[in-house]
Regions:
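Glycosyltransferase specificity loop/lid
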Residues: 1-281, 288-291, 300-302, 306, ...
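Hydrophobic pocket-lining residues within nucleotide cofactor-binding pockets
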Residues: 294
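Active-site cores of enzymes that catalyze phosphoryl transfer or operate on phosphate-rich substrates
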Residues: 316
Length: 558
Protein backbone atom coordinates (compact mmCIF):
# COMPACT_ATOMS: atom_id res chain seq x y z
CA UNK A 1 0.00 0.00 0.00
CA UNK A 2 1.37 3.43 -1.00
CA UNK A 3 0.95 6.34 1.38
CA UNK A 4 0.40 9.61 -0.46
CA UNK A 5 1.45 12.62 1.57
CA UNK A 6 1.16 16.20 0.33
CA UNK A 7 4.45 17.88 -0.51
CA UNK A 8 5.39 21.46 -1.19
CA UNK A 9 8.09 23.05 -3.30
CA UNK A 10 9.11 26.69 -3.51
CA UNK A 11 10.26 28.27 -6.77
CA UNK A 12 12.67 31.21 -6.60
CA UNK A 13 12.94 32.70 -10.11
CA UNK A 14 14.84 35.58 -11.60
CA UNK A 15 12.89 38.45 -13.13
CA UNK A 16 14.19 37.73 -16.65
CA UNK A 17 11.19 36.47 -18.61
CA UNK A 18 13.32 34.20 -20.78
CA UNK A 19 14.30 32.37 -17.58
CA UNK A 20 11.04 32.68 -15.66
CA UNK A 21 8.66 31.46 -18.38
CA UNK A 22 10.19 27.98 -18.82
CA UNK A 23 10.54 27.67 -15.04
CA UNK A 24 6.85 28.54 -14.66
CA UNK A 25 5.94 25.95 -17.29
CA UNK A 26 8.16 23.37 -15.59
CA UNK A 27 6.42 24.05 -12.28
CA UNK A 28 2.94 23.70 -13.78
CA UNK A 29 3.92 20.48 -15.53
CA UNK A 30 5.23 19.09 -12.24
CA UNK A 31 1.91 19.93 -10.59
CA UNK A 32 0.10 18.20 -13.44
CA UNK A 33 2.26 15.10 -13.22
CA UNK A 34 2.35 14.83 -9.40
CA UNK A 35 -1.10 15.27 -7.78
CA UNK A 36 0.41 15.46 -4.29
CA UNK A 37 2.63 18.47 -5.09
CA UNK A 38 1.92 22.05 -4.03
CA UNK A 39 3.78 25.08 -5.38
CA UNK A 40 4.65 28.49 -3.98
CA UNK A 41 6.08 30.83 -6.62
CA UNK A 42 7.88 33.87 -5.19
CA UNK A 43 7.96 36.61 -7.83
CA UNK A 44 8.85 40.28 -8.08
CA UNK A 45 6.23 42.94 -8.91
CA UNK A 46 7.73 43.67 -12.34
CA UNK A 47 6.99 40.18 -13.67
CA UNK A 48 3.76 39.47 -11.78
CA UNK A 49 1.50 40.75 -14.62
CA UNK A 50 3.24 38.51 -17.16
CA UNK A 51 2.94 35.51 -14.84
CA UNK A 52 -0.76 36.18 -14.32
CA UNK A 53 -1.25 36.61 -18.08
CA UNK A 54 0.54 33.33 -18.77
CA UNK A 55 -1.59 31.50 -16.21
CA UNK A 56 -4.74 32.77 -17.92
CA UNK A 57 -3.65 31.65 -21.40
CA UNK A 58 -5.68 29.01 -23.21
CA UNK A 59 -2.67 26.69 -23.07
CA UNK A 60 -3.15 26.30 -19.33
CA UNK A 61 -6.94 26.16 -19.17
CA UNK A 62 -6.64 22.61 -17.83
CA UNK A 63 -5.16 23.75 -14.52
CA UNK A 64 -8.52 25.24 -13.50
CA UNK A 65 -10.51 22.04 -14.16
CA UNK A 66 -11.07 19.53 -11.39
CA UNK A 67 -9.86 15.97 -12.08
CA UNK A 68 -8.10 17.16 -15.27
CA UNK A 69 -7.51 14.85 -18.18
CA UNK A 70 -4.03 14.02 -19.36
CA UNK A 71 -0.94 13.11 -17.42
CA UNK A 72 -2.18 14.91 -14.32
CA UNK A 73 -5.34 12.83 -13.98
CA UNK A 74 -5.64 11.30 -10.55
CA UNK A 75 -8.07 8.35 -10.61
CA UNK A 76 -9.09 6.43 -7.48
CA UNK A 77 -6.60 3.70 -6.65
CA UNK A 78 -7.45 1.03 -4.06
CA UNK A 79 -3.75 0.53 -3.34
CA UNK A 80 -3.26 4.15 -2.30
CA UNK A 81 -3.98 5.15 1.29
CA UNK A 82 -4.77 8.75 2.15
CA UNK A 83 -3.77 9.56 5.70
CA UNK A 84 -6.12 12.52 6.16
CA UNK A 85 -9.42 13.80 4.82
CA UNK A 86 -7.46 16.62 3.19
CA UNK A 87 -5.36 14.11 1.25
CA UNK A 88 -8.48 12.12 0.30
CA UNK A 89 -9.90 15.27 -1.26
CA UNK A 90 -6.65 15.94 -3.09
CA UNK A 91 -7.70 13.97 -6.14
CA UNK A 92 -10.73 16.20 -6.65
CA UNK A 93 -8.73 19.44 -6.67
CA UNK A 94 -7.94 21.50 -9.71
CA UNK A 95 -4.24 21.94 -10.37
CA UNK A 96 -4.56 25.68 -9.75
CA UNK A 97 -5.71 24.92 -6.20
CA UNK A 98 -2.20 23.60 -5.54
CA UNK A 99 -0.53 26.81 -6.73
CA UNK A 100 0.04 30.12 -5.00
CA UNK A 101 1.86 33.10 -6.51
CA UNK A 102 3.30 35.42 -3.87
CA UNK A 103 4.85 38.82 -4.53
CA UNK A 104 8.12 38.93 -2.62
CA UNK A 105 9.09 42.54 -1.99
CA UNK A 106 9.57 44.75 1.05
CA UNK A 107 7.00 47.39 2.10
CA UNK A 108 9.74 50.01 1.68
CA UNK A 109 10.12 49.34 -2.04
CA UNK A 110 8.80 52.31 -4.01
CA UNK A 111 6.59 50.91 -6.77
CA UNK A 112 7.37 52.80 -10.01
CA UNK A 113 4.98 53.97 -12.69
CA UNK A 114 7.31 52.52 -15.33
CA UNK A 115 9.89 49.74 -15.10
CA UNK A 116 13.30 50.92 -16.27
CA UNK A 117 16.41 48.68 -16.17
CA UNK A 118 17.67 50.70 -13.20
CA UNK A 119 14.45 50.20 -11.24
CA UNK A 120 14.42 46.48 -12.06
CA UNK A 121 17.98 46.25 -10.70
CA UNK A 122 16.82 47.92 -7.46
CA UNK A 123 13.89 45.51 -7.34
CA UNK A 124 16.29 42.58 -7.63
CA UNK A 125 18.32 43.80 -4.67
CA UNK A 126 15.16 44.25 -2.61
CA UNK A 127 14.02 40.73 -3.57
CA UNK A 128 17.30 39.24 -2.35
CA UNK A 129 17.00 41.17 0.91
CA UNK A 130 13.35 40.21 1.47
CA UNK A 131 13.54 36.54 0.42
CA UNK A 132 14.71 35.19 3.83
CA UNK A 133 11.64 36.62 5.54
CA UNK A 134 9.27 34.88 3.14
CA UNK A 135 11.15 31.58 3.24
CA UNK A 136 11.12 31.68 7.04
CA UNK A 137 7.36 32.22 7.06
CA UNK A 138 6.85 29.27 4.70
CA UNK A 139 9.16 26.98 6.66
CA UNK A 140 7.43 27.99 9.91
CA UNK A 141 4.03 27.25 8.34
CA UNK A 142 2.76 30.73 9.13
CA UNK A 143 -0.77 31.70 8.08
CA UNK A 144 0.30 35.01 6.54
CA UNK A 145 3.20 35.87 4.26
CA UNK A 146 3.62 39.60 4.79
CA UNK A 147 -0.14 40.07 4.67
CA UNK A 148 -0.84 37.45 1.99
CA UNK A 149 -2.61 34.26 3.04
CA UNK A 150 -0.46 31.14 2.90
CA UNK A 151 -2.72 28.53 1.27
CA UNK A 152 -0.35 25.76 2.28
CA UNK A 153 0.33 26.62 5.90
CA UNK A 154 -0.08 22.96 6.87
CA UNK A 155 2.68 21.81 4.50
CA UNK A 156 6.25 22.97 5.09
CA UNK A 157 8.42 23.13 1.94
CA UNK A 158 10.17 19.88 0.99
CA UNK A 159 12.49 21.30 -1.67
CA UNK A 160 13.39 24.51 -3.50
CA UNK A 161 13.88 25.05 -7.22
CA UNK A 162 15.81 28.25 -7.91
CA UNK A 163 17.26 30.04 -10.91
CA UNK A 164 20.98 29.28 -10.93
CA UNK A 165 21.86 32.95 -11.49
CA UNK A 166 20.43 33.76 -8.03
CA UNK A 167 23.63 32.57 -6.41
CA UNK A 168 22.62 33.74 -2.93
CA UNK A 169 19.75 31.24 -2.61
CA UNK A 170 21.70 28.26 -1.14
CA UNK A 171 23.15 30.42 1.63
CA UNK A 172 19.79 32.09 2.31
CA UNK A 173 17.92 28.78 2.60
CA UNK A 174 20.65 27.35 4.85
CA UNK A 175 20.53 30.41 7.09
CA UNK A 176 16.75 30.33 7.41
CA UNK A 177 16.55 26.62 8.25
CA UNK A 178 19.52 26.75 10.62
CA UNK A 179 17.87 29.61 12.48
CA UNK A 180 14.69 27.55 12.80
CA UNK A 181 16.70 24.48 13.84
CA UNK A 182 15.31 22.56 10.88
CA UNK A 183 17.24 20.20 8.60
CA UNK A 184 18.40 21.38 5.19
CA UNK A 185 16.08 20.55 2.29
CA UNK A 186 17.20 19.73 -1.28
CA UNK A 187 17.95 22.61 -3.64
CA UNK A 188 17.59 22.14 -7.39
CA UNK A 189 19.24 24.72 -9.66
CA UNK A 190 17.23 25.59 -12.77
CA UNK A 191 19.24 26.46 -15.88
CA UNK A 192 17.13 27.35 -18.95
CA UNK A 193 19.69 25.95 -21.35
CA UNK A 194 21.04 22.77 -22.86
CA UNK A 195 23.67 20.49 -21.34
CA UNK A 196 26.42 21.71 -23.69
CA UNK A 197 26.09 25.36 -22.67
CA UNK A 198 25.65 24.44 -19.00
CA UNK A 199 28.89 22.45 -19.12
CA UNK A 200 30.63 25.31 -20.96
CA UNK A 201 29.53 27.78 -18.28
CA UNK A 202 29.98 25.79 -15.07
CA UNK A 203 32.79 23.29 -15.71
CA UNK A 204 36.03 23.73 -13.81
CA UNK A 205 38.61 25.90 -15.54
CA UNK A 206 40.92 22.99 -16.31
CA UNK A 207 38.04 21.26 -18.09
CA UNK A 208 37.04 24.27 -20.17
CA UNK A 209 34.61 26.18 -17.94
CA UNK A 210 34.27 29.88 -18.73
CA UNK A 211 32.98 31.32 -15.45
CA UNK A 212 35.72 29.75 -13.35
CA UNK A 213 38.36 31.04 -15.78
CA UNK A 214 36.86 34.52 -15.71
CA UNK A 215 36.69 34.52 -11.90
CA UNK A 216 40.37 33.64 -11.58
CA UNK A 217 41.42 36.37 -14.03
CA UNK A 218 39.18 38.91 -12.31
CA UNK A 219 40.62 38.06 -8.89
CA UNK A 220 44.18 38.37 -10.23
CA UNK A 221 43.53 41.78 -11.79
CA UNK A 222 41.85 43.11 -8.65
CA UNK A 223 44.79 41.84 -6.56
CA UNK A 224 47.10 43.77 -8.88
CA UNK A 225 45.19 47.00 -8.30
CA UNK A 226 42.58 47.04 -11.07
CA UNK A 227 39.18 48.54 -10.27
CA UNK A 228 36.54 45.89 -9.51
CA UNK A 229 34.12 47.04 -12.21
CA UNK A 230 36.91 47.35 -14.75
CA UNK A 231 38.08 43.81 -14.03
CA UNK A 232 34.59 42.37 -14.46
CA UNK A 233 34.04 44.32 -17.66
CA UNK A 234 37.36 43.15 -19.05
CA UNK A 235 36.73 39.45 -18.50
CA UNK A 236 32.96 39.20 -19.06
CA UNK A 237 32.62 36.47 -21.69
CA UNK A 238 36.32 36.92 -22.43
CA UNK A 239 37.78 35.40 -25.60
CA UNK A 240 41.42 34.76 -26.41
CA UNK A 241 41.53 33.21 -29.87
CA UNK A 242 41.93 29.66 -28.61
CA UNK A 243 40.20 26.58 -29.98
CA UNK A 244 37.39 25.42 -27.69
CA UNK A 245 35.69 22.05 -28.07
CA UNK A 246 32.41 21.48 -26.25
CA UNK A 247 31.22 17.86 -25.83
CA UNK A 248 29.04 16.79 -28.73
CA UNK A 249 29.67 19.92 -30.80
CA UNK A 250 32.24 20.73 -33.50
CA UNK A 251 35.40 22.62 -32.45
CA UNK A 252 35.42 26.41 -32.77
CA UNK A 253 37.52 29.36 -31.71
CA UNK A 254 36.38 30.54 -28.30
CA UNK A 255 35.07 33.82 -29.71
CA UNK A 256 32.68 31.94 -32.01
CA UNK A 257 30.59 30.77 -29.06
CA UNK A 258 29.54 34.40 -28.33
CA UNK A 259 29.46 35.68 -31.90
CA UNK A 260 27.58 38.97 -31.51
CA UNK A 261 28.27 39.79 -27.88
CA UNK A 262 30.21 42.88 -28.97
CA UNK A 263 26.97 44.45 -30.26
CA UNK A 264 25.25 44.25 -26.86
CA UNK A 265 26.36 46.69 -24.15
CA UNK A 266 26.69 44.76 -20.89
CA UNK A 267 27.30 46.75 -17.70
CA UNK A 268 30.03 45.17 -15.55
CA UNK A 269 27.54 45.04 -12.69
CA UNK A 270 25.47 42.53 -14.67
CA UNK A 271 28.39 40.11 -14.92
CA UNK A 272 29.24 40.71 -11.27
CA UNK A 273 25.72 39.55 -10.44
CA UNK A 274 25.91 36.21 -12.23
CA UNK A 275 29.51 35.00 -12.09
CA UNK A 276 29.27 33.84 -8.42
CA UNK A 277 26.74 31.25 -9.61
CA UNK A 278 29.64 29.02 -10.74
CA UNK A 279 30.71 28.64 -7.11
CA UNK A 280 27.20 28.56 -5.65
CA UNK A 281 26.06 25.72 -7.89
CA UNK A 282 28.66 23.49 -6.20
CA UNK A 283 27.26 24.29 -2.75
CA UNK A 284 26.76 21.02 -0.82
CA UNK A 285 23.06 21.81 -0.48
CA UNK A 286 22.55 21.77 -4.26
CA UNK A 287 21.58 18.22 -5.16
CA UNK A 288 20.84 18.62 -8.84
CA UNK A 289 20.41 20.74 -11.95
CA UNK A 290 17.32 20.78 -14.13
CA UNK A 291 17.61 21.75 -17.81
CA UNK A 292 14.45 22.13 -19.95
CA UNK A 293 16.04 20.42 -22.95
CA UNK A 294 16.20 16.87 -24.30
CA UNK A 295 19.01 14.51 -23.34
CA UNK A 296 18.57 12.34 -26.43
CA UNK A 297 19.55 15.28 -28.67
CA UNK A 298 22.95 15.78 -26.96
CA UNK A 299 24.01 12.56 -25.19
CA UNK A 300 27.75 13.40 -25.09
CA UNK A 301 27.13 16.77 -23.46
CA UNK A 302 24.79 15.25 -20.87
CA UNK A 303 27.36 12.59 -20.00
CA UNK A 304 30.10 15.23 -19.67
CA UNK A 305 27.91 17.47 -17.50
CA UNK A 306 26.96 14.61 -15.17
CA UNK A 307 30.62 13.66 -14.80
CA UNK A 308 31.64 17.29 -14.22
CA UNK A 309 29.04 18.12 -11.57
CA UNK A 310 28.90 14.79 -9.76
CA UNK A 311 25.18 15.00 -9.00
CA UNK A 312 21.83 14.41 -10.70
CA UNK A 313 21.13 16.25 -13.94
CA UNK A 314 17.40 16.37 -14.64
CA UNK A 315 17.04 16.70 -18.42
CA UNK A 316 13.35 17.55 -18.21
CA UNK A 317 12.77 18.38 -21.88
CA UNK A 318 11.16 21.51 -23.37
CA UNK A 319 8.34 22.66 -21.13
CA UNK A 320 4.97 22.88 -22.85
CA UNK A 321 1.47 21.94 -21.68
CA UNK A 322 0.10 18.60 -22.85
CA UNK A 323 -2.13 20.30 -25.42
CA UNK A 324 0.91 21.73 -27.19
CA UNK A 325 2.61 18.34 -27.34
CA UNK A 326 -0.62 16.92 -28.79
CA UNK A 327 -0.58 19.54 -31.54
CA UNK A 328 -3.65 21.37 -30.29
CA UNK A 329 -3.65 25.08 -31.13
CA UNK A 330 -6.72 26.97 -29.91
CA UNK A 331 -7.91 29.91 -31.95
CA UNK A 332 -5.59 32.77 -30.89
CA UNK A 333 -7.12 35.71 -29.09
CA UNK A 334 -5.64 39.17 -29.62
CA UNK A 335 -4.72 40.82 -26.32
CA UNK A 336 -3.66 44.16 -27.81
CA UNK A 337 -3.24 46.08 -31.07
CA UNK A 338 0.07 44.39 -31.92
CA UNK A 339 -1.54 40.96 -31.62
CA UNK A 340 -4.44 42.01 -33.84
CA UNK A 341 -2.05 43.37 -36.48
CA UNK A 342 -0.01 40.17 -36.45
CA UNK A 343 -3.00 37.84 -36.78
CA UNK A 344 -4.54 39.92 -39.57
CA UNK A 345 -1.21 40.01 -41.40
CA UNK A 346 -0.72 36.24 -41.19
CA UNK A 347 -4.24 35.55 -42.45
CA UNK A 348 -3.65 37.95 -45.33
CA UNK A 349 -0.28 36.41 -46.22
CA UNK A 350 -1.76 32.92 -46.26
CA UNK A 351 -4.33 34.03 -48.81
CA UNK A 352 -1.78 35.97 -50.86
CA UNK A 353 1.31 33.73 -50.72
CA UNK A 354 0.06 30.42 -49.34
CA UNK A 355 0.94 28.28 -46.35
CA UNK A 356 4.45 28.38 -44.86
CA UNK A 357 5.32 31.54 -46.79
CA UNK A 358 6.18 33.95 -43.94
CA UNK A 359 9.45 34.19 -42.03
CA UNK A 360 9.22 35.30 -38.42
CA UNK A 361 12.15 37.45 -37.28
CA UNK A 362 12.73 37.86 -33.55
CA UNK A 363 15.89 38.11 -31.45
CA UNK A 364 14.15 37.50 -28.15
CA UNK A 365 13.16 39.71 -25.25
CA UNK A 366 16.69 40.72 -24.25
CA UNK A 367 19.17 40.82 -27.15
CA UNK A 368 19.54 43.36 -29.96
CA UNK A 369 22.58 44.55 -31.98
CA UNK A 370 22.65 47.94 -30.26
CA UNK A 371 26.09 48.99 -31.55
CA UNK A 372 25.35 47.71 -35.07
CA UNK A 373 21.67 48.51 -35.72
CA UNK A 374 22.41 48.47 -39.44
CA UNK A 375 22.38 44.68 -39.24
CA UNK A 376 18.62 44.78 -38.70
CA UNK A 377 18.23 47.19 -41.60
CA UNK A 378 20.19 44.87 -43.88
CA UNK A 379 18.11 41.85 -42.87
CA UNK A 380 14.73 43.50 -43.29
CA UNK A 381 15.62 45.29 -46.51
CA UNK A 382 17.02 42.06 -47.93
CA UNK A 383 13.80 40.23 -47.14
CA UNK A 384 11.78 43.02 -48.75
CA UNK A 385 13.97 42.99 -51.87
CA UNK A 386 13.59 39.21 -52.11
CA UNK A 387 9.81 39.39 -51.87
CA UNK A 388 9.89 37.34 -48.67
CA UNK A 389 6.94 38.29 -46.40
CA UNK A 390 8.00 38.71 -42.79
CA UNK A 391 7.02 39.64 -39.26
CA UNK A 392 9.67 41.45 -37.24
CA UNK A 393 9.25 41.70 -33.46
CA UNK A 394 11.77 43.72 -31.45
CA UNK A 395 10.83 43.13 -27.82
CA UNK A 396 14.19 44.01 -26.24
CA UNK A 397 14.24 47.16 -24.13
CA UNK A 398 17.47 47.99 -25.95
CA UNK A 399 15.79 47.85 -29.36
CA UNK A 400 14.56 50.73 -31.45
CA UNK A 401 13.74 51.07 -35.12
CA UNK A 402 14.81 54.14 -37.16
CA UNK A 403 11.83 56.19 -38.32
CA UNK A 404 12.81 56.01 -41.99
CA UNK A 405 13.02 52.22 -41.90
CA UNK A 406 9.74 52.02 -40.01
CA UNK A 407 8.05 54.17 -42.66
CA UNK A 408 9.59 52.15 -45.47
CA UNK A 409 8.24 48.93 -44.01
CA UNK A 410 4.85 50.39 -43.13
CA UNK A 411 4.37 51.11 -46.83
CA UNK A 412 5.08 47.47 -47.72
CA UNK A 413 2.06 45.18 -47.41
CA UNK A 414 4.30 42.10 -47.10
CA UNK A 415 5.97 43.46 -43.95
CA UNK A 416 4.66 43.53 -40.39
CA UNK A 417 6.69 45.23 -37.64
CA UNK A 418 5.60 45.12 -33.99
CA UNK A 419 7.26 45.60 -30.63
CA UNK A 420 5.82 42.40 -29.19
CA UNK A 421 4.40 39.40 -31.03
CA UNK A 422 2.49 36.44 -29.54
CA UNK A 423 5.31 34.11 -30.52
CA UNK A 424 3.66 30.74 -29.84
CA UNK A 425 0.66 31.74 -31.96
CA UNK A 426 2.91 33.11 -34.70
CA UNK A 427 5.12 30.04 -35.10
CA UNK A 428 2.07 27.77 -35.18
CA UNK A 429 0.09 29.79 -37.74
CA UNK A 430 -0.35 28.06 -41.10
CA UNK A 431 1.21 31.04 -42.90
CA UNK A 432 4.48 30.86 -40.94
CA UNK A 433 7.17 28.74 -42.55
CA UNK A 434 10.52 29.87 -41.13
CA UNK A 435 12.09 31.49 -38.07
CA UNK A 436 15.11 33.82 -37.92
CA UNK A 437 16.14 33.72 -34.28
CA UNK A 438 18.92 34.39 -31.78
CA UNK A 439 18.44 30.71 -30.82
CA UNK A 440 17.66 31.14 -27.16
CA UNK A 441 16.29 28.05 -25.45
CA UNK A 442 12.62 29.10 -25.57
CA UNK A 443 12.64 30.12 -29.23
CA UNK A 444 14.58 27.00 -30.21
CA UNK A 445 12.09 24.73 -28.45
CA UNK A 446 9.11 26.48 -30.04
CA UNK A 447 10.68 26.25 -33.50
CA UNK A 448 11.24 22.51 -32.99
CA UNK A 449 7.67 21.87 -31.96
CA UNK A 450 6.36 23.98 -34.86
CA UNK A 451 8.70 22.18 -37.31
CA UNK A 452 10.16 25.45 -38.63
CA UNK A 453 13.52 25.61 -40.44
CA UNK A 454 15.61 28.29 -38.78
CA UNK A 455 18.11 31.02 -39.54
CA UNK A 456 20.48 31.64 -36.62
CA UNK A 457 21.85 34.96 -35.41
CA UNK A 458 23.21 34.15 -31.94
CA UNK A 459 24.64 36.78 -29.59
CA UNK A 460 25.95 35.25 -26.34
CA UNK A 461 24.91 33.09 -23.37
CA UNK A 462 23.87 29.64 -24.66
CA UNK A 463 22.90 30.77 -28.16
CA UNK A 464 26.17 29.73 -29.79
CA UNK A 465 25.81 26.19 -28.47
CA UNK A 466 22.20 25.92 -29.64
CA UNK A 467 23.20 27.30 -33.04
CA UNK A 468 26.03 24.79 -33.46
CA UNK A 469 23.67 21.94 -32.60
CA UNK A 470 20.95 23.17 -34.96
CA UNK A 471 23.09 24.18 -37.92
CA UNK A 472 25.98 21.70 -37.82
CA UNK A 473 24.77 18.61 -35.98
CA UNK A 474 21.13 18.41 -37.11
CA UNK A 475 21.29 20.77 -40.11
CA UNK A 476 17.92 22.39 -39.44
CA UNK A 477 19.23 25.96 -39.39
CA UNK A 478 21.45 28.27 -41.42
CA UNK A 479 23.96 30.19 -39.32
CA UNK A 480 24.52 33.76 -40.55
CA UNK A 481 28.28 34.29 -40.60
CA UNK A 482 28.88 37.70 -42.15
CA UNK A 483 26.91 39.48 -39.40
CA UNK A 484 29.17 38.12 -36.65
CA UNK A 485 30.76 40.88 -34.57
CA UNK A 486 33.47 39.78 -32.14
CA UNK A 487 34.93 41.73 -29.21
CA UNK A 488 38.36 41.93 -30.86
CA UNK A 489 38.68 43.18 -34.46
CA UNK A 490 41.60 40.77 -34.84
CA UNK A 491 39.16 37.88 -34.70
CA UNK A 492 37.68 37.67 -38.17
CA UNK A 493 38.25 34.06 -39.18
CA UNK A 494 36.03 31.14 -38.22
CA UNK A 495 37.34 27.67 -37.44
CA UNK A 496 35.80 26.36 -40.67
CA UNK A 497 37.93 28.83 -42.65
CA UNK A 498 35.24 31.44 -43.34
CA UNK A 499 36.54 35.01 -43.26
CA UNK A 500 34.03 37.45 -41.78
CA UNK A 501 34.18 40.47 -44.10
CA UNK A 502 31.17 42.10 -42.44
CA UNK A 503 30.45 44.74 -45.08
CA UNK A 504 26.95 45.57 -46.28
CA UNK A 505 27.74 43.91 -49.60
CA UNK A 506 29.00 40.70 -47.99
CA UNK A 507 26.11 40.54 -45.53
CA UNK A 508 23.42 41.10 -48.15
CA UNK A 509 24.99 38.54 -50.49
CA UNK A 510 24.85 35.93 -47.72
CA UNK A 511 21.30 36.93 -46.84
CA UNK A 512 20.08 36.55 -50.43
CA UNK A 513 21.67 33.12 -50.64
CA UNK A 514 20.01 32.19 -47.35
CA UNK A 515 16.52 33.21 -48.51
CA UNK A 516 16.99 31.32 -51.78
CA UNK A 517 18.08 28.21 -49.87
CA UNK A 518 15.12 28.35 -47.51
CA UNK A 519 12.63 28.56 -50.36
CA UNK A 520 14.32 25.84 -52.39
CA UNK A 521 14.67 22.05 -52.06
CA UNK A 522 17.16 22.34 -49.19
CA UNK A 523 14.61 24.37 -47.21
CA UNK A 524 12.14 21.52 -47.45
CA UNK A 525 14.87 19.05 -46.51
CA UNK A 526 15.56 21.19 -43.42
CA UNK A 527 11.87 21.07 -42.57
CA UNK A 528 11.88 17.27 -42.84
CA UNK A 529 14.94 17.06 -40.57
CA UNK A 530 13.26 19.38 -38.07
CA UNK A 531 10.24 17.08 -38.13
CA UNK A 532 12.54 14.17 -37.28
CA UNK A 533 14.11 16.18 -34.45
CA UNK A 534 10.67 16.99 -33.09
CA UNK A 535 9.88 13.27 -33.05
CA UNK A 536 12.92 12.68 -30.84
CA UNK A 537 11.94 15.29 -28.26
CA UNK A 538 8.28 14.17 -28.29
CA UNK A 539 9.25 10.56 -27.65
CA UNK A 540 11.52 11.63 -24.81
CA UNK A 541 8.66 13.62 -23.29
CA UNK A 542 6.24 10.70 -23.65
CA UNK A 543 8.35 7.81 -22.40
CA UNK A 544 12.06 8.67 -22.56
CA UNK A 545 14.60 10.51 -20.43
CA UNK A 546 12.45 13.66 -20.17
CA UNK A 547 9.50 11.72 -18.72
CA UNK A 548 11.79 9.77 -16.40
CA UNK A 549 13.42 12.93 -15.06
CA UNK A 550 10.11 14.77 -14.64
CA UNK A 551 8.86 11.87 -12.54
CA UNK A 552 12.08 11.83 -10.50
CA UNK A 553 12.09 15.60 -10.00
CA UNK A 554 8.70 15.53 -8.28
CA UNK A 555 10.04 13.11 -5.67
CA UNK A 556 13.61 14.43 -5.31
CA UNK A 557 13.05 15.18 -1.61
CA UNK A 558 12.25 11.59 -0.68
Amino acid sequence: MTVIKPSHFVVVPTAMWGHLRPLLHLSLNLLTLHPNLHLTLLVTPSVLPRVEHELKSTSFAHIYTKSPSGSGTSTPNPNVHHTTAQEQAQEDKAIADRLQVITCISPEFDMPKEWSPEVIAQEGMDYAKTLPKFLQALASKEHKLDGTENKFEDIAPNFVVYDSFLHFVPEVVRGVLTGLQKPMIPLIAFIPSNAAATWHTFAKEENGGTFTLAQRLIDEDIANGMDVLEAHGKHAFGTYGKVKTIPGLPPKFDYEWWPNFATVPMPPQAFMGIIPSAKAIRDPAVSGIVCPTTAETEPLAVEALEKEMGFRIYMAGPQFPDAAWAGEHPEPQAQNADDANVFAFLDKMKKKHGAKSVIYVSLGSLFFPVTRPELIRYILQSLKESGFPFIFAYASQMASLPEDLQKELNDDEDSCVVKFAPQWDVVNHEATGYFLSHCGSNSTAEAMLAELPMVSMPFAADQGEFTAMLSEVYKVSIDLKQVKTFKSPDFNKLYDGTVVVGTEEAIKAELKQTWDTLRGPEGEAMRARMRDLKAVIKKSWADGRSKKDMLALGTCFE
